[in-house]
Amino acid sequence: MVELMALLLIKEDGSGKLDANSYATAADCDGYHDGHLYATAWTGATQSKKEAALVMATRLVDSQFQFNGFRAHSEQALQWPREKCPDPDASLLTISVLGWVGDNFVEPDLVPAAVAQATCEMARELLIVDRTAAPAGEGLDTVATAHATHAATGTSSDSTSSTTKYNKSDTRPIISRVAQAMLSKYGALVDGGSGAVRLVRA
């Protein structure tokens, strides 16, 4: 019998680790969720559940978003740290006829706080529901219609028919709207898509 090894969370600290699998630690997220009004799913989870959620959240962030610039190290495991990724919050900016110049890039030896915070936000969401799972139906609504037979026909049987239609507005984004807002300053969803899975409302 093969014994599975326990998950080991390895935080990316900005050095471009080859084996990093998370942008934040459970302790980082404890601090992020401190005072969060709806943090019960996180605060009530075990340490192992928290770390598993963080690793999965990091995978989703990296797979669903393409960040600007390029990886700081060719062999690093995650998308961050990055070179030449514009920083909209940089304080030293100079405008020239050639565009933005000066110290307006995210430092190539760090992970932006917003990326770590978005990872924490997604980890909490994943402890509530698997955002990668599309429920049965894949966005298809089936409406049943009952047809009562008129008394004049002399029969008492009823019949039922159903109509199936696709509800394009019935979707759930894989990356939550809150996390998307945090990450969008540094990049965009892959292929400009919505990053959503289809839902069926009960």
Question: How should these model regions be labeled?
Answer:
Residues 2-202:
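Divalent metal-cofactor coordination and adjacent catalytic microenvironments
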